[in-house]
């Protein structure tokens, strides 16, 4: 693999330990930023996940899954620290905690990435729990600032988790101010702003960076795309849902795919891709990255509305 990727997602790759019954556990590779990179690669975009994983069986599984997805392996660092684990002890509703006090992800070093990578990358994505876990948090914030200064487009999905308490507030403000595209869900907003009504929280978030493009996802109700004083909305198409794991990651990835591959398209079309991507991810169990064919088959089923007109 000689060429450098045009899309990079930086953050955490982890192992979900899922409780099945009283005494049985299964493992599954995951991590929101890793999954966004995997979806982009599945859609045909030369992509990489930039992060660090343990040098053990857990890291081996993530390395294999990354290779199978077509991610550039030069961006995945292997370190002699423990793995980052998400212990999911109840599924519905999900209850979990993270194990990784001194795990490999925390020691990711951007200086070890391939020379010239930031010159080739047109978009770099940040988010997930990586931005809530020092010292990785500070490493990624500094990287995002440097990339922004160099003219690289930044996308950001906070992907709220319980460890994002008031200590995360400065990170939320800084990353929102830096980002060109921000994806957030109604549940994210209620968690991040510690509130019951997501609409005032969305307005508060947008006030930090009024010029950014916001993808606001609403689960089964679809999504909105907001830019300046304009809003587009789209209900989710009807699909046979296997589960919703990874739908948010697929949604932001599909939006970024559309912005990268058809920048001249209107916002209605970009939103179609985002909503179709999220729906396509629901067709298979687990965080299964959708194919471009699956996504494009769903595009005609996505109707986009703006404040004045309806577009079929």
Model-identified regions with their sequence ranges:
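Conserved phosphate-binding/catalytic region of the ribokinase-like
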Residues: 1-6, 198-312
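Active-site beta-loop-alpha junctions enriched in small/polar residues
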Residues: 101, 129, 159-161, 187, ...
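Conserved N-terminal subdomain of the carbohydrate kinase-like
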Residues: 46-126, 152, 298-312
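Glycine-rich phosphate/adenosyl-contacting loop at the front of the ribokinase-like
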Residues: 1-69, 308-312
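Short, well-ordered alpha-helix to beta-strand connector turns
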Residues: 4, 120-121, 179, 211
């Amino acid at each position: 693999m000689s060429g450098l990727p045009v899309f990079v997602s930086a953050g955490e790759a982890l192992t979900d330990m899922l409780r099945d019954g009283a005494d049985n556990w299964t493992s599954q590779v995951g991590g929101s930023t890793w999954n966004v990179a995997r979806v982009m690669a599945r859609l045909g975009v030369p992509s990489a996940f930039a992060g660090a994983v343990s040098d053990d069986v857990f890291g081996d599984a993530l390395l294999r899954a990354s290779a199978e997805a077509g991610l550039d392996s030069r961006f995945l660092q292997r370190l002699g620290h423990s793995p980052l684990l998400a212990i999911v002890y109840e599924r519905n509703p999900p209850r979990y905690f993270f194990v990784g006090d001194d795990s490999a992800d925390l020691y990711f070093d951007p200086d070890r990435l391939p020379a010239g990578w930031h010159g080739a990358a047109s978009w770099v994505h940040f988010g997930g729990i990586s931005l809530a876990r020092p010292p990785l948090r500070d490493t990624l914030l500094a990287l995002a600032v440097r990339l922004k200064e160099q003219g690289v487009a930044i996308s950001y999905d906070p992907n709220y988790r319980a460890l994002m308490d008031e200590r995360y507030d400065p990170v939320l403000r800084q990353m929102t101010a830096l980002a060109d595209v921000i994806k957030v869900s109604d549940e994210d907003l209620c968690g991040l702003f510690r509130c019951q009504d997501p609409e005032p929280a969305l307005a508060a978030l947008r006030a930090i960076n009024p010029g950014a493009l916001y993808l606001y996802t609403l689960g089964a109700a679809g999504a909105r795309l907001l830019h300046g004083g304009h809003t587009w909305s789209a209900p989710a198409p009807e699909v046979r849902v296997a589960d919703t794991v990874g739908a948010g990651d697929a949604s932001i990835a599909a939006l970024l795919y559309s912005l990268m591959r058809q920048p001249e398209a209107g916002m209605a079309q970009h939103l179609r891709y985002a909503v179709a991507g999220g729906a396509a991810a629901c067709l298979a169990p687990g965080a299964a990255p959708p194919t471009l064919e699956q996504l494009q088959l769903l595009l005609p089923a996505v109707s986009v509305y703006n404040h004045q007109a309806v577009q079929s």
